[in-house]
């Protein structure tokens, strides 16, 4: 079966998604992409999991979906996924979330929706990065100055130097990005009651392995799998091993 591209209206916004039909008796796989990415990134993985019905969405602001109709918070993205599941009447859903998509998966799974049966977090974000004291001081000093129009180019250089390329990549989503990264999901992890698989790249620099271990300890029914010779996009670096772990867990 081919992967079909479709659209749906959710909360007044067009949401683009990709769908491949599989065994109707098997669990449904719902893939959530990371920041600056889109649903297409999962197509190779979906192709290797052809026995399952699979969906991958473009979050509002990414891919071919509409921009958010306001400055989104993580809860808004969680509601988009929840409404997507309801509108398509999906049951026995397994969410597979990468990076930012993992954040959304954590947020939704912590509310124990009956439609979700399992959760797979892939190099997931969600543990808030702790700024060191120097960065906090610098931020307090330069934030008011940054607002001056003639310092726009300087602002971009400093943001890049501080590792905030995601902030610059999607200017329409800058406040949304700030809302997202400022939310620490640590307190939600113990509320996840469904079986959870953590798949992590051994050399992930964006979501360090220490975050994976924190999540494994906090989520009651969880297991961590570390893929060697992989980075933040472990499912791209080692697709075959990634897919094999999915099949074992599902």
Question: Residue spans of the language-model regions?
Answer:
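Alpha/beta-hydrolase fold catalytic core
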Residues: 1-29, 50-52, 90-91, 132, ...
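Flexible "cap/lid" loop of the alpha/beta hydrolase fold
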Residues: 103-111, 117-148
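Short beta-strand/loop motif that positions the catalytic acidic residue
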Residues: 192, 198-200, 204
């Amino acid at each position: 079966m081919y992967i079909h591209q479709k659209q749906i209206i959710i909360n007044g916004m067009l949401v683009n998604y990709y769908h491949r039909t599989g065994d109707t008796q098997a669990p449904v796989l719902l893939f959530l992409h990371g920041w600056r990415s889109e649903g297409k990134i999962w197509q190779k993985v979906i192709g290797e999991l052809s026995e399952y019905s699979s969906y991958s969405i473009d979050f509002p602001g990414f891919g071919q979906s509409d921009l958010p109709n306001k400055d989104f918070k993580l809860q808004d993205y969680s509601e988009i996924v929840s409404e997507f599941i309801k509108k398509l009447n999906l049951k026995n859903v397994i969410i597979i979330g990468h990076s930012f998509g993992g954040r959304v998966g954590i947020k939704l799974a912590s509310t124990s929706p009956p439609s979700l049966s399992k959760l797979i977090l892939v190099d997931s974000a969600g543990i808030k990065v702790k700024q060191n004291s120097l960065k906090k001081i610098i931020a307090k000093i330069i934030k008011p100055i940054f607002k001056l129009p003639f310092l726009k180019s300087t602002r971009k250089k400093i943001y890049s130097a501080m590792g905030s390329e995601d902030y610059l990549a999607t200017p329409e989503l800058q406040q949304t990005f700030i809302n997202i990264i400022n939310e620490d999901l640590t307190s939600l992890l113990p509320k996840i009651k469904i079986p959870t698989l953590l798949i992590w790249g051994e050399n992930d620099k964006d979501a360090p392995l220490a975050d994976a271990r924190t999540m494994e300890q906090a989520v009651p029914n969880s297991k961590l799998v570390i893929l060697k010779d992989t980075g933040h996009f472990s499912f791209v670096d080692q697709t075959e091993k990634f897919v094999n772990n999915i099949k074992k867990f599902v």
